């Protein structure tokens, strides 16, 4: 009996940290937002508004993802990997035309924290140049500079660098780990169970399972009364309350 109890205790101790990583409680996200206020995790509001962000764009799935977003009267911030942008200018044009927006996700799909400062700065600058070209082609100004680090990890040096470059670092508060988990239904249920006013959803382009996930998530959020917004729209909506 004592052995069984010990094994159960060990199992609980092993499972709890993984569960907290998979579904961090609101209190933990609130702590992160206080601890690193220069990083955007969520916004504080009682309004039924929620931010949608799409990482690892553009890809062969971008046009369908954007179509689903548009069908649900939603907007999103697409975080772009610079090495994927050449040859997908039409996707970028369509994103901007639709009222969604472009953000910076560095040049390659790798952990930004592992890069030397000079290389990261160069990559952010190069992706920024490409984003500016996309906006200029549409005769529209860049309204904001958002950077999301590859793999989602950052340190104090990166925060200082990003701030010096005039960028707002963005993480989020609802992440279904869809970059690794291919079950669209599981990912959709994760998002819907974590959605709350002011949340920022992180999901990924370049994965075919994102499409059915969004087909389930976006109509359900609308049914619950949420407006689904880009980061700029989300921040502006909160500013009107002040």
PLM feature segments, named:
Residues 59-61, 109-112, 154-157, 177, ...:
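Active-site environment of divalent metal-dependent phosphoester hydrolases
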Residues 153, 158-194, 226-237:
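His/Asp/Glu-enriched short active-site or ligand-binding loop at hydrolase and phosphoryl-transfer sites
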Residues 1-39:
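N-terminal membrane-anchoring alpha-helices
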Residues 134-154, 159-160:
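Basic- and aromatic-lined ligand-binding clefts that recognize polyanionic substrates
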Residues 54-56, 80-82, 104-106, 149-151, ...:
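A cross-domain feature marking catalytic cores of carbohydrate-active enzymes
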Residues 221:
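Conserved nucleotide-state-sensing and coupling region of NTP-binding domains
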Residues 26-115, 119, 123-136, 142-144, ...:
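Active-site beta->alpha N-cap acidic-glycine motif
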């Amino acid at each position: 009996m004592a052995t069984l109890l010990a094994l159960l205790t060990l199992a609980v101790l092993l499972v709890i940290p993984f569960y907290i990583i998979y579904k961090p409680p609101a209190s933990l996200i609130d702590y992160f937002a206080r601890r690193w206020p220069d990083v955007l995790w969520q916004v504080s509001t009682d309004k039924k508004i929620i931010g949608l962000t799409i990482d690892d764009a553009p890809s062969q799935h971008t046009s369908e993802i954007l179509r689903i977003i548009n069908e649900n009267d939603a907007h999103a911030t697409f975080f772009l990997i610079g090495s994927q942008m050449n040859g997908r200018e039409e996707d970028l044009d369509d994103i901007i035309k639709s009222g969604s927006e472009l953000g910076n996700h560095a040049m390659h799909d790798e952990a930004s924290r592992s890069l030397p400062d000079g290389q990261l700065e160069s990559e952010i600058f190069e992706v920024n140049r490409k984003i500016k070209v996309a906006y200029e082609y549409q005769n529209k100004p860049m309204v904001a500079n958002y950077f999301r680090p590859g793999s989602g990890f950052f340190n104090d040096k990166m925060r200082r660098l990003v701030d010096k470059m005039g960028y707002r670092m963005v993480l989020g508060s609802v992440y279904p780990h869809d970059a690794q988990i291919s079950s669209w239904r599981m990912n959709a249920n994760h998002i819907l169970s974590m959605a709350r006013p002011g949340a920022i959803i992180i999901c990924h382009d370049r994965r075919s399972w994102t499409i059915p996930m969004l087909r389930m998530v976006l109509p359900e959020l609308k049914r619950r009364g949420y407006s689904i917004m880009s980061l700029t729209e989300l921040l502006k909506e909160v500013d009107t309350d002040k």
